[in-house]
């Protein structure tokens, strides 16, 4: 049956469609932190995230990155290829910030000589623990070849994103990606890309991402609107 709720997430609800290989993602006006411990409804956030993520994924598709994105069909909805999500949060860091700075006792804002890729086990009950390649294999999440591909693809995506954000005066600090297996067993980029799952700083070091919500720095939607407007000006 179509339009049946498949999954309710922190920022999106997922529905079935008439095509068994296609799902509908509906973006919500909800901001969360501490793995959902703090929740707040922020009017307009869903529309902005859908627009930003759709724009980024369209550009990634055009650049030859295999993604789940098909098309945006309304202000808050988009169609995606159905995937089996790999239970990994793949984090790439260009600059020290957030939990990385806390974990290693270093100040925020230090450029990393080489971008660092980290894995976190997607498990709410365990609070998404930081894991390494050996843990990934032990948990039977991915094999050596798949791990290498995910890392390589994440680094390739990073180079594209860094260039695009640099063109609009924003510094890409870090971001989180999720991947999944499509119907043919191919690993493709899934989930979303928005200021919800990346850190962006402007030339003055102002936060242009969900840290505005996490750190009570002002209006989240005002910041997201600026990011969207800048992205819409990309050539």
UniProtKB/Swiss-Prot annotation:
Annotated metabolic or biological route of this protein: Purine metabolism; IMP biosynthesis via de novo pathway; 5-amino-1-(5-phospho-D-ribosyl)imidazole-4-carboxamide from 5-amino-1-(5-phospho-D-ribosyl)imidazole-4-carboxylate: step 1/2
Class of this enzyme: ligase
GO annotation terms (biological process): 'de novo' IMP biosynthetic process; cobalamin biosynthetic process
InterPro entries, alphabetized: SAICAR_synt/ADE2_N, SAICAR_synt_PurC, SAICAR_synth, SAICAR_synthetase, SAICAR_synthetase_CS
Enzyme Commission identifier(s): 6.3.2.6
This protein's UniProt keywords: ATP-binding, Ligase, Nucleotide-binding, Purine biosynthesis
Pfam family of the protein (one): SAICAR_synt
Catalytic activity from the UniProt record: 5-amino-1-(5-phospho-D-ribosyl)imidazole-4-carboxylate + L-aspartate + ATP = (2S)-2-[5-amino-1-(5-phospho-beta-D-ribosyl)imidazole-4-carboxamido]succinate + ADP + phosphate + 2 H(+)
Molecular functions (GO terms): ATP binding; phosphoribosylaminoimidazolesuccinocarboxamide synthase activity
Family affiliation: Belongs to the SAICAR synthetase family.
Protein name as catalogued: Phosphoribosylaminoimidazole-succinocarboxamide synthase
Organism from which the protein derives: Streptococcus thermophilus (strain CNRZ 1066)
């Amino acid at each position: 049956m179509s339009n049946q709720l498949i999954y309710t997430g922190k920022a999106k609800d997922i529905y079935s469609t008439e095509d068994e290989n296609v799902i509908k993602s509906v973006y919500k006006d909800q901001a969360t932190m501490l793995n959902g411990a703090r929740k707040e409804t922020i009017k307009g956030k869903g529309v902005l995230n859908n627009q930003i993520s759709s724009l980024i994924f369209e550009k990634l598709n055009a650049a030859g990155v295999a993604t789940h994105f098909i098309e945006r069909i309304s202000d808050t909805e988009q169609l995606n290829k159905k995937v089996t999500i790999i239970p990994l949060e793949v984090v790439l860091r260009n600059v020290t910030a957030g939990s990385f700075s806390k974990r290693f006792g270093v100040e925020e804002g230090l450029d990393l000589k080489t971008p660092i890729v980290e894995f976190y086990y997607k498990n709410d009950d365990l609070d998404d623990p930081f894991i390494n390649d050996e843990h990934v294999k032990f948990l039977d999440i991915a094999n050596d070849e798949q791990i290498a591909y995910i890392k390589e693809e994440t680094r390739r995506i990073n180079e594209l994103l860094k260039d695009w954000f640099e063109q609009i005066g924003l510094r890409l600090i870090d971001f989180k990606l999720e991947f999944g297996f499509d119907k043919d067993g191919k690993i493709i980029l899934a989930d979303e890309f928005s200021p919800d799952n990346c850190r962006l700083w402007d030339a003055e070091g102002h936060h242009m991402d969900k840290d505005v919500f996490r750190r009570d720095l002002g209006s989240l939607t005002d910041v997201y609107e600026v990011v969207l407007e800048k992205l819409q000006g990309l050539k």
